[in-house]
Amino acid sequence: MIRYFTAGESHGPALSAIVEGMPAGVALTESDINDQLARRQQGYGRGGRMKIETDRAEVLSGVRFGKTIGSPVAMLIRNRDWENWTTSMAQFEDHATEVQKITIPRPGHADLTGFVKYGFDDIRPVIDRSSARETAARVAAGSLARAFLRQLGIQIGSYISTIGPVSEAAAPASLQELLDAGAESLAAEADKSPVRMLDPEAETAAIAAIDQAKADGDTLGGIVELYITGVPMGLGSYVQHDRRLDSELAAAIMSIQAIKGVEIGPAFDNARKPGSQVHDELFAGGEKGLRRETNRAGGIEGSMSSGQPIHIRAAMKPISSLVSPLSSFDLATLEAVQSRFERSDTCAVPAAGVVAEAVVAPVIANALLEKLGGDHMAEIKERLEVYRAALRMRFEK
């Protein structure tokens, strides 16, 4: 089972990630990790932090001669901004009397709840660990599982369909063609846009909306469209709640900072339709074998992969750190004040798509390993080929 842990604060010396359970023999390059980190830093509407950091992962263990060796992979991502925070975020020297405590929580952030939960007298520790800066470590961790899946013909990609008031009118005409080529083709096409949208008209309108929000001291959220292609039928299980593939994917997506909603396929649209217009009809036989002509289930039926592209939609709320502040209060005095501003983005939805790609990779990898077993890439590949061949033979005439 692949699992990972991250550590580090936004303004500390570094972020780190440890990935355990990677099979041996997975080919890996520095670009497999660092290219994903670079994608996370892109996107129109990002803040000043992106001008400071150029994220690169230092792999400390678990890889030899360009292949994983089965032991935990440890990675370090240094924070260049640390040099400006050595006093405020010192690990051992006590600079409490030199640093002004932050006691004004921002509405919508972890500030207040984290302050109360952990008994702090200063919000700074909450800000620095709850920050979405932590997702850099998760993208690095997810890139390992992503490389594993890619070598088995499974690809992950995303694009953005909504930013603030701007939505694409319909699914892009090129979507199916991109998915047929693999979800990474979809991601590559989306990456050509500064807002990762596929519709040029929507892109122009979204950029204008971000500019207006920035001028107003406001922020914007949006919707991520995530696809996973090449997933064989039968991953996950209906037998127990904690083995349901859709629930595991939803949990992974919901763990991303500022994500407040998830649906598998067009779930909320499906809820407004009769069943006869929702369920994907089944066909078998002939050269095409088992097939469906629609994918309103989003690639998951009965909490198991159906063999179609898995489609996940994720709603990101607007970032909670506003230049134009909302009402708050001072935790030290309980006096009403305006909330404070912490350096932030106007819109981070394009980056959220990249993070979403990263966090679902270990979920799919684990479902595949549960189905096939194996400790080395060669035996896993062989078992998957046998399984895919058996599926083809079962439904072809």
From Swiss-Prot:
Task: Look up the record and name the pathway of this protein.
Answer: Metabolic intermediate biosynthesis; chorismate biosynthesis; chorismate from D-erythrose 4-phosphate and phosphoenolpyruvate: step 7/7
Purpose = This reaction introduces a second double bond into the aromatic ring system.
For activity, the cofactor(s) needed are: FMNH2
Q: What Gene3D superfamilies does this protein map onto?
A: Chorismate synthase AroC (3.60.150.10)
Q: What does the record give as the organism's lineage?
A: Bacteria, Pseudomonadati, Chlorobiota, Chlorobiia, Chlorobiales
Cellular component terms per the entry's GO annotation: cytosol
PROSITE patterns named among the record's database cross-references:
CHORISMATE_SYNTHASE_1
Query: How is the subunit organization of this protein annotated in UniProt?
Result: Homotetramer.
> What is the species of this protein?
Chlorobaculum tepidum (strain ATCC 49652 / DSM 12025 / NBRC 103806 / TLS) (Chlorobium tepidum)
Residue positions binding NADP(+):
40, 46
Listed name of the protein: Chorismate synthase
Alphabetized GO MF terms: chorismate synthase activity; FMN binding
- InterPro entries assigned to the protein according to its UniProt record, in alphabetical order: Chorismate_synth (IPR000453), Chorismate_synth_AroC_sf (IPR035904), Chorismate_synthase_CS (IPR020541)
